[in-house]
Every structure is written in structure tokens, then in C-alpha cells.
Amino acid sequence: MPRSSRHVPAGLLAGLIAVALLAQPARAQIDLREYAARRAALTARIDSGVVVAFGGVEPVNYWPTFFQVPGFAYLTGFGESDAILTMVKRNGAVTSTLFVPVRTPVRERWEGTRTRAADLEKKTGVPGRDIAGFRGAIDSLAASGLPFYIVSDAETDDFVSRDTLTRGSRFVSQLRLANPWLVMQPLDGAVSRLRARKSPAEIALLRRATEISTRAHQEAMKAAAPGCGEYEIQALLEGTFRRFGGDRPGYGSIVGSGPNATILHYMEDSRVMRDGELLLIDAATSFDHYSSDVTRTMPVNGKFSPAQRALYQIVRDAQEAFVRRIKIDVSSDSAYDAGKAVVADGLLRLGLIQAADATIDPPEGMRCPEGGCLQLQLFALHGFGGHGVGLEVHDPAQYYEEINDRWGAGDVFTVEPGLYVSPELLASLPDTPKNRAFLAKVRPTVEKYAGMGVRIEDVYALTEQGLEWLSSGAPREIPEIEALMRQREPELAGGGSCGRPRT
């Protein structure tokens, strides 16, 4: 890896892109010259050497959906499988090549038409070669003594399995075995730093992905009702994504009613909703491979009960406290502290905790900071600051500690506070004197709120012009949600009870 003191000069990528896109009309598409600027910004980080970036491989079985490796997609915009990019830098000059499989009529009858190597330069801006020539090219470059920098394909383990024996990792092992003197360094961190700052074209794609996603949330709010299956709402959401131009769900759609709303990554979507419960929907589409991430919580019967309203409003107020502190070149720490203070005050007011700094002896698997596990951690299971969005639903962001630790222009990210009162919460605590004293105080209140889960997740883009709320299309204030849910919607196909009039 390049020395930590070697950074892309501030604004280099933005400057390259600005020059490349001068006089280009604004549109929801990334120009080939922007991809060229990204590659130039990456190779600017090395004096000389060979950069090798691996695309994703075609799934062995046909039912998994192919996902391009995000780092590779960022550098090339090429969405087909089994491709490899090389960039060779010598004496300041860079030669790039995109290696792709040879087209065969039989394979194309099964998998569809692929881009020929001869057509790659027109399509991607990078000259192409058949992948059969990749090994010979690499052996020749290794013999030259140039250092190698690898942009790995390990990110694919997020999509399929935890197996890290990817094509890229095997390549590194084999190359090192054949050339033990060769200098080899990862370049993934450099790519993440570039990806963290979104260009205007990327923000436009994320804006459109979020608009489609919020439209789907509106449809879900109008359809949800007692007796409706979570799976029916899932189908409605994902159908709406496609109907309005989305590629696919950006991640597994979470449609959790009742106790399922307290499971953060619940994806079975198999339960029938009941009157008096909350419904938590965490679902969004990708658009041109850029994924949004939106969550809304609503009452199944269209009317928040007093208890539901109280829990929901704490989450909403915490989100607002966090958002008010978002500014360029500011750490997220102060925003987190502000949101946490709102949550602590709200939980104390409801009687779910004894004090803002009160602790418990944690259940198995709970991670705690120094000083012990706060009681509020039983209900606030994750941070408020969310994550970046982009080519991955959890994308790099400049305010991440390992990148810049400060918000910057071009950050696109979520703010997603949540509170969850699991029905199993009390039983999960170890039997200790401290916990017995805690339970004696809060048990009746915990039982009152048991089975309620609330999360509100919104997408924001931070630019020099200010903070843009991209997900404003999905209602999040209690009166707005209830008003939308009073609207009638035709029954879903299949005879489900979703959308029937409320009494």
C-alpha cells in the first residue's frame, strides 16, 4: 500500500471530474470521462507499478443474481462478469486494458450477449483484450520488476458467502508463489477513499434511486392493513421499484410486523399483520447500480396508539437532533451525542431505563464500551449516524473514522436512529443482583412496550450548497403517516386483504 503520507491532493478527483464534464448536460448517468478521471485519481497515488482490479465472477448456479464488485464497477462502469482491469504506470504514463472472456455462441444462448473485446473501448473508454492473454501479460509485467497494487474482489463475500477465496485472492497467492521477490500491496483503501466522495452524477443517481424507493414506501403505507401478509407488502415494494425504473432491491427487503419489527435484519417477510401492531419497512431500490436505503415505521391499523406514538416520537426527535448538527468538516461525534441524549431522556421519561448513565450486566454477545453496558443499549442497538450509500448499500463515507473522520462535500449517507423492545429482552439478561434491581423497576414498562420496534432512516446528500434530504417523499411525521394510511388502495393481486378500507 502507498505510504500513509501519500494522499490524493484534496479536490484532485473532483477537479478532474469537473474538467471532464464541463459543458456536459446534467443527466442521471455517469459519463465515460468520469470513469477515466477516477482511474487517473487512483493511479496518481502510485509512482509506478501495475494496478490489477478484479470484477465479479458469474455464479456457478444460475439462481443467484450477479453483482459486480463495487470497486471494479467504480473504476470501469462495466457490468459484465469475469472481467479484469489492469493499469500499468511507467514514467508518468498509464496504459489501461480491460480483459474479458471470449464470446461463444453456446454460452450466449444460455446467458445472453456479451461485449466483445474489440467493442470495449467504445463502451467503457478502456481498450479490451481477450482474457486468454491475461496470464501472459501479467507474467511479462512481473518479470519487469514493477510493483503490483491489487483492487480485490473480496467485497463479493457480502453478497454470496463469507468465503474469501475469491479469484483475486487466488491470483495474489499464485503470483507471490511464482515471484517471491515481487512487491505487492492492496489498493482497496485508496478506492474506498475515492468512492467516499460522490460526484454530482453519482448524487443524481442516488437521488433517483431514493425517489423511487420513497414512492414504494408511499404505496406500502396505503396498502398495509390488519390481515395483510408481510410478503404482500414486500411484493408491492419490489414491484414498485421495477415499475418506476429501479434495477433491483438494493438489499433484502425488511418487512417486519409486531415482534418482527424488533429484529434488525428480519427478511423472512412471512407473517400476517395484526391489528394494534407496528410495521417496520426497511427497503430501497438501486438505480443504475446505486442503492438507496430508506426505513419507515407505521401502525398496521393506520392509527398510532399512545404507547406507539411515544416510542416513535423519541426516535424522530433523536433523528432531528442528529441532523441539525451535520456540517462540512465537522465530526459526527457531536451529532451522535445529541441524538443519544434525546434517546436517554425519552427512555427515562417512559420508565424503560433508570438513568442516562445507568448500566446493566449485559446479555451474551452484547458489546459494550469502557465503563460498562448502558441500559439504553438494550433498546438502542445501533448508532444513529448510519452509513454511506452508493454502489453498495453500506458504502464508504468521508465521515468514517478510517477515511477522514469529518463530513465533507459529496457525502451521501443515512441517518437511522431506532428503538427496539424485544419480547425476549427480559429473559435474555443474566441473573445478577444488578439486573434483578433493574428488572424490578422497569419490568411493567418493558412489558407495555414489548414487541414494538421503531426505526426511521433517511438519506441525505451534503454539498457545498447545503444538506439535501433525498428521502423526503416518504412521510415520517405521525400526522402525515396517518393521513396517507387513510387513503384507500385497491387490493393486491392474489386476493390479499392489503388495502381494504379501515374502520
Please identify what each model-predicted range represents.
Residues 1-13:
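Bacterial N-terminal signal peptides that target proteins for export
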Residues 2-3, 26-503:
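Active-site neighborhoods and metal-handling regions in enzymes and metal-associated proteins
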Residues 11-23:
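Bacterial N-terminal signal peptides
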